[in-house]
Amino acid sequence: MGTTKVTPYLIFATSVAAIGSFQFGYNTGVINAPEMIIRDFLNYTLDEKLDEPPSRLLLTNLWSLSVAIFSVGGMIGSFSVGLFNRFGRRNSMLIVNLLAVIGGCLMGFCKISESVEMLILGRLVIGVFCGLCTGFVPMYIGEISPTALRGAFGTLNQLGIVIGILVAQIFGLEIILGSEVLWPVLLGFTIIPAILQSAALPFCPESPRFLLINKKEEDEAKQILQRLWGTQDVAQDIQEMKEESARMAQEKQVTVLELFRAPSYRQPIIISIVLQLSQQLSGINAVFYYSTGIFKDAGVKEPIYATIGAGVVNTIFTIVSVFLVERAGRRTLHLIGLGGMALCSVLMTVSLLLKDKYDTMSLVCIAAILIYVAFFEIGPGPIPWFIVAELFSQGPRPAAMAVAGCSNWTSNFLVGLLFPSAAYYLGAYVFVIFAVFLVAFFIFTFFKVPETRGRTFEDITRAFEGQAAEANKLGKGPTMEMNSIQPIETTTHV
């Protein structure tokens, strides 16, 4: 493999793709700040249409539906990433922006139309769009990035998400767009990134792996690689893709069921699912969904600004992980993140229990939340998204991304649905549940998750196939030793 460079073209292409991640983050966080204003809109609109004032239960259920329908749309969208093989990586991202525009228009005009249905339908449509983005973006970035930089560029997916959440928190302030007059603009803002990405995508390359392996366009794939990576010596990478293409020609199309049936796919798909669960069941979204209330319970006078502070920490440590992931490796960072979050979860529980007795415990709670967020962005935040693309070859990758994405969205939905009840009955002890999950995921990662830093897609696939073949001979399930994949030496210039 030749010397690769971080070229402006590579930065441009990955940044444009990451706008889809920004959309996911923005639409995840945008609904929280104007909650009371939207509840008033639901009350007023239904009061005008119904013969009698809407009940408190009906209003609560409609609000919950407005929030949760986003995750339902995400589940649907995540299982539709098969579009990637039909239309190509770049064109698929371009096409689905139509959903962002439709969803944004529905939400943006729901107030002037006095339509609760438009708000809920808009959240569903934008959820489908974001579900597609959670599959499209990490796959595209992984396929256009050099092996030596795949982890660093893969982290840009998570960076886009956290920047989106932070922008939503800031725009949601009452002095900006979170007011009774401008909240539809806050929800409809998602149209602008969609238009910007649609304008920029035609100037981005198609995935060279898709061109060579799926379309058999070797010359064009070679030219794109040379321009993206800033080197003429891409012969080894082209040869690796051709070998993978030959293997694909001998295999039948990989379905979701085949991922669980075939021994060579079973181990990596289980790892992919568990890593996605480790992200959501870590409790991060519970902390962000209800961070304002948590800070308020901890004694913070202006909790909304403390929540934004947590968003800033979120963004800073995502940037830190960009520089760490190719040095420390995926597995190591994930373990550090899980372990640190488990300790912080226990610390949050203790500090919330003792805050009324000791004033300093409020500061301890705030510090625990901020450190918890920092550990999340070191490992469980960015790594599960792009490591799925690394564990599979070109054939099963879209199906694997669909399964992993659906696992993430489903667990996200369940946490959002169940956390309020759990917090009501358990109080501060609710974070002990997340601590137990984090310890379990730490143990799984330590024994089952391989290091993929510096390895080609083909190398990783062969390692799993070798393990599966050996396991079949021994008559037991396939396993992957934690050190069975070691990084190769590469030269990279910035």
From Swiss-Prot:
Keywords: Cell membrane, Cell projection, Glycoprotein, Membrane, Phosphoprotein, Sugar transport, Transmembrane, Transmembrane helix, Transport. Detected in stomach, placenta, lung and brain. Glycans are attached at N43. D-glucose binds at Q158, Q279, Q280, N285, N314, E377, W385. Residues 276-278 are annotated as: Important for selectivity against fructose. The modification Phosphothreonine is found at T231, T491. It catalyses: D-glucose(out) = D-glucose(in); D-galactose(in) = D-galactose(out). Deoxyglucose transport is inhibited by D-glucose, D-galactose and maltose. Galactose transport is inhibited by D-glucose and maltose. It is found in: Cell membrane; Perikaryon; Cell projection. PANTHER family: SOLUTE CARRIER FAMILY 2, SOLUTE CARRIER FAMILY 2, FACILITATED GLUCOSE TRANSPORTER MEMBER 3. SUPFAM superfamilies: MFS general substrate transporter (SSF103473). Residues 33-64, 111-117, 174-182, 290-303, 352-362, 420-428 are extracellular. Facilitative glucose transporter. Can also mediate the uptake of various other monosaccharides across the cell membrane. Mediates the uptake of glucose, 2-deoxyglucose, galactose, mannose, xylose and fucose, and probably also dehydroascorbate. Does not mediate fructose transport. Required for mesendoderm differentiation. Transport is mediated via a series of conformation changes, switching between a conformation where the substrate-binding cavity is accessible from the outside, and a another conformation where it is accessible from the cytoplasm. One of its GO terms (molecular function) is galactose transmembrane transporter activity. This is Solute carrier family 2, facilitated glucose transporter member 3. The modification Phosphoserine is found at S484. Interacts with SMIM43; the interaction may promote SLC2A3-mediated glucose transport to meet the energy needs of mesendoderm differentiation. GO terms for cellular component: cell projection; membrane; perikaryon; plasma membrane. The chain crosses the membrane at residues 11-32, 65-84, 90-110, 118-141, 153-173, 183-203, 269-289, 304-324, 331-351, 363-388, 399-419, 429-449.
